[in-house]
Structure formats: C-alpha cells, structure tokens
C-alpha cells in the first residue's frame, strides 16, 4: 500500500487531470454549439428580418388565387400563362421569401420547392421583361390655335 506522502501528489495530479479533461470537453461542446448555430443561420440565409418574412408570408397567402391560376394555366409547354399573371406585389413577396426568408414557407400554401422555384423564375422573367420593354411615349397635348384680339389696336 502506498504511503500517505505519495498518495497526496497522486490524488492531486488525478484531480488536476480530471479538471483539465472536463474543461476541454466543455470548451469543445461550446464550440460545437456555436458552429451548429452558425450553420443553421446560413441555411436560412438570414438577411430578412422576422417582420419582413412574416409580411411576405401574409402577402403570399393573399396571392393564392393568382398563384393557383398561374399553375393551372401552365400546360408543361412554353405557352404564356393567363393574361394578368402574377402582379408585382406578389412577385415581391415571392422574391423576398426565396432570397431572404425560409423558402419552406411555400409549403404553408401547399406548394413544393420546385413550384416555388417556378414562381421565382417567372417573377424574375417578368421583372427583366418590364425592364427591357420601352416605356410608352408621353402623350402630347394638342391645343387648338386661339386668336387673341386687343381692343383698340388695329393692325
């Protein structure tokens, strides 16, 4: 059996090693949690704040008629959708959801990710189309000639 004088340093070194191992474990777990949190933030893209995303979701809900008509008008070909299509407000909400919020929000409307991508592509195409189309010429105002006479002045 070990003497009393050798058991103290042995006990002290055992406690010191236990402390170091537990500290290392806590640091590793804390760093792992930070990395996991960062990964979750990048999955969400993080640029949109909660209120913007919430408002975009509400806008999407109010656009369901337009979205349903859009998908019903698609026949799997390159034919244009029904006249009117999806308006700028709905396209703005779709763009915000795809780029800055959770694209999973489309599932709240019963849409798949592929359908969400189709909506995004349509809205991007409409935005490009409106940028490329020339703006209408301003209307000119045609005035009829008026004869002005001044009393007392004869020419």
Curated annotation (Swiss-Prot):
Keyword Signal: yes
Database matches in Pfam families: Prolamin_like
Localization per Swiss-Prot or TrEMBL: Cytoplasmic vesicle; Secreted
Domain of life: Eukaryota
A GO biological process held by the record: regulation of double fertilization forming a zygote and endosperm
UniProt signal peptide: 1-32
Alphabetic keyword roster: Cytoplasmic vesicle, Fertilization, Secreted, Signal
Tissue: Restricted to female reproductive tissues, specifically accumulating in storage vesicles of the unfertilized egg cell.
Function, as annotated: Involved in the regulation of gamete interactions during the double fertilization and to prevent multiple-pollen tube attraction; mediates the redistribution of the gamete fusogen HAP2/GCS1 to the cell surface after secretion upon sperm arrival.
PANTHER family: EGG CELL-SECRETED PROTEIN 1.5 (PTHR35293:SF1)
Protein name: Egg cell-secreted protein 1.5
Organism for this UniProt entry: Arabidopsis thaliana (Mouse-ear cress)
């Amino acid at each position: 059996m070990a003497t009393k004088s050798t058991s103290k340093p042995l006990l002290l070194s055992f406690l010191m090693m236990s402390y170091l191992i537990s500290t290392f474990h806590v640091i590793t777990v804390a760093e792992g949690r930070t990395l996991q949190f960062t990964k979750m933030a990048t999955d969400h893209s993080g640029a949109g704040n909660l209120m913007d995303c919430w408002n975009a979701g509400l806008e999407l809900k109010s656009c369901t008629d337009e979205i349903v008509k859009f998908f019903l008008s698609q026949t799997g070909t390159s034919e244009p959708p029904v006249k009117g299509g999806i308006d700028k407000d709905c396209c703005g909400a779709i763009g915000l959801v795809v780029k800055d919020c959770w694209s999973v929000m489309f599932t709240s409307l019963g849409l798949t990710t592929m359908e969400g991508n189709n909506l995004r592509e349509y809205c991007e195409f409409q935005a490009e189309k409106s940028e490329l189309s020339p703006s209408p010429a301003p209307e000119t105002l045609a005035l009829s000639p008026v004869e002005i006479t001044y009393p007392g002045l004869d020419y």
